[in-house]
Amino acid sequence: MGFQDQRSKEAFARANGVLPGGVNSPVRAFKSVGREPIFIAKGQGARLWDIDGNSYLDYVLSWGPLILGHAHPVVVGAIKAAAERGTSYGAPTEIETECAEEVIKAFPSMEMVRMVSSGTEATMSALRLARGVTGRNKIIKFEGCYHGHGDSLLIKAGSGALTFGVPTSPGVPSSVASQTIVAQYNDLEGLKEIFKECGEDIAAVILEPVTGNMGVVLPQPGFLAGLRTLTQDYGSLLIFDEVMTGFRVSYGGAQGRYQIDPDLTCLGKVIGGGLPVAAYGGKRKYMEQVAPSGPIYQAGTLSGNPLAMAAGLATLKLLQQEGVYEGLEKKTTRLAEGLQSIAQELGFPIWVNSVGAMFSAFFTDQPVIDFKSACSSDVERFGSFFRGMLERGIYLAPSQYEAVFLSAAHTDADIDYTLEQARDVLKSLG
């Protein structure tokens, strides 16, 4: 039986009656790839099954958290054992401390950690902390970098060299947007000009050290080190949003891979083992300013939830096994380079950026080093590629500007099959 999606279509129609756009997060609606979404029934290992019975090799992995694959038996066992003792206490537990200790071992720049429930919560809290400890209001973010849906982060670049932000969403006050300056990723000289203009007012610079939300874009040599020096010179905090890259591009994240220590770090995704967990942390002198030890407030009913801590701790312990990251990177590189090779052979313009266990294939003929070059991608052609791959049992992110993720559960045979299907789809696109 070939690809079927009637039940998913019916489920989406039903969902549209009670959920805005039929989904609980916009990209899940598949709008940018020209079709309706599939509805998932279950996941196991590297595979997903939808409610129509179609099976897929999954390269989305819940947008990155499932680095061990779906329903890993050790992680599931940890969740079950925790649930039998209670699902939430709203009180301290030993496992919170144990999780924090494991995170700190992996990220030496983090001397203290606060657990929260989402990446958005982590970045919002880190920015509040940066403003609180510096006494400054302005922040710098980079065009194309996504840090959650906090008001001060839903900002795009305005016009001119000193690009004070403008809101990208109704409901974000212009007074909030005006406190955010939007810079260009990998443009260190442009950043220097911004700091010359208003460096004494800048509380923090926040960025994905490797971007994942305009697709995977790698830092150019010297960019992160120059940014570290620049922020130190002006007394501004450097915040790495490693929600996506933490425990994925290496066990110690992008900062471990590139040997750059930020002042504050935001984590999420992998540290929850598939459950809602995030964290922010950094140097003790800053984190001690967070309530109740300091005056900068942050709280959460489900922060440090015992089920999430159990899943996260089990995941981190498994990731510490010898050879895990070497295997992940080897498979990722093989898939990324294989796709690039097939595209070149067939005369398709595709640019691939790959690092650790994530990569992006941009449908463009130019190097992708920033937001502008990422936007040169042919999104319609990507949409056609996505649909063709989906119908052949390959589940990619439904957006040109998202990453491909691999897990420890993906096999060489999975990669072979994926490349075979990619060749067929690209041939069909002419």
From Swiss-Prot:
Its UniProt pathway annotation is:
Porphyrin-containing compound metabolism; protoporphyrin-IX biosynthesis; 5-aminolevulinate from L-glutamyl-tRNA(Glu): step 2/2
Any single Gene Ontology cellular-component annotation: cytoplasm
Q: Name one GO molecular function term.
A: glutamate-1-semialdehyde 2,1-aminomutase activity
Q: Which reaction does it catalyse?
A: (S)-4-amino-5-oxopentanoate = 5-aminolevulinate
| Lineage top rank: taxon | Bacteria
User: In Gene Ontology terms, what is a biological process of this protein?
Assistant: protoporphyrinogen IX biosynthetic process
Organism in which the protein naturally occurs: Desulfitobacterium hafniense (strain Y51)
Q: Which InterPro entries match?
A: 4pyrrol_synth_GluAld_NH2Trfase, Aminotrans_3, Aminotrans_3_PPA_site, PyrdxlP-dep_Trfase, PyrdxlP-dep_Trfase_major, PyrdxlP-dep_Trfase_small
Similarity comment: Belongs to the class-III pyridoxal-phosphate-dependent aminotransferase family. HemL subfamily.
- What lineage does UniProt assign to this protein's organism? Bacteria, Bacillati, Bacillota, Clostridia, Eubacteriales
Q: What is this protein called?
A: Glutamate-1-semialdehyde 2,1-aminomutase
Which residues get modified to N6-(pyridoxal phosphate)lysine? K269
